[in-house]
């Protein structure tokens, strides 16, 4: 059991939850794994997301709309979710693949942040 799992076990026990019950015995591990995933963007660099960019002659704006996201509010660790529209102008005749914009949103959303 790692330190996050031990801390979660201690927290749940301090609330009076019986972790010996059949459906609760692995809850500290599951919750620690969940939070590791929810905060995984902290360990990722946004510049690593872009990967290959493509040449383009297009001069206008590029829009990727209604990208779903979920994140965690850093005040109370409550989840929030929604959609985001990203609009950007290609720089120096290069454009990112549309999936990379969605990937970038996911990296940024997987960081604790204010939801206000």
Residues of each region from the PLM?
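N-terminal intrinsically disordered, cationic/polar leader segments
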Residues: 1-116
């Amino acid at each position: 059991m790692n330190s996050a799992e031990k801390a979660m076990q201690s927290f749940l026990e301090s609330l009076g939850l019986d972790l010996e019950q059949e459906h609760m015995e692995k809850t500290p591990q599951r919750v620690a794994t969940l939070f590791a995933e929810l905060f995984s963007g902290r360990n990722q660099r946004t510049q690593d997301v872009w990967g290959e960019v493509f040449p383009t002659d297009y001069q206008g704006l590029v829009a990727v709309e209604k990208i779903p996201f979920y994140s965690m509010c850093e005040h109370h660790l409550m989840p929030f979710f929604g959609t985001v529209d990203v609009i950007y102008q290609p720089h120096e005749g290069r454009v990112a693949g549309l999936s990379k914009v969605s990937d970038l949103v996911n990296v940024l959303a997987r960081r604790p942040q204010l939801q206000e």
